[in-house]
């Protein structure tokens, strides 16, 4: 439950609620979303590297760099969508719900893949 729920409220409040709003006061909306999303992607370097190591996918510095880079890019792209939802809805509720759904699907997929066969 920590992955789907424990990080979402904190991350959405920090990134879309505080950072995006603060940057939106000093720069246009598009650049504020881009900066927020890039920082959101970079925030996930540690968890992505840990997931690659735990699942035996690191395979050396080159593979680790490629995997982390892909994870950061995907998370930053997701951040753009979450930021768009924040802007479009005027609320944190929509990005929180999408973030919970995304994290929950990832946790469910990991559980299905790693559970013992019956």
Question: Where do the language-model regions lie?
Answer:
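Transmembrane helix-loop-helix hairpins at the membrane interface
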Residues: 1-118
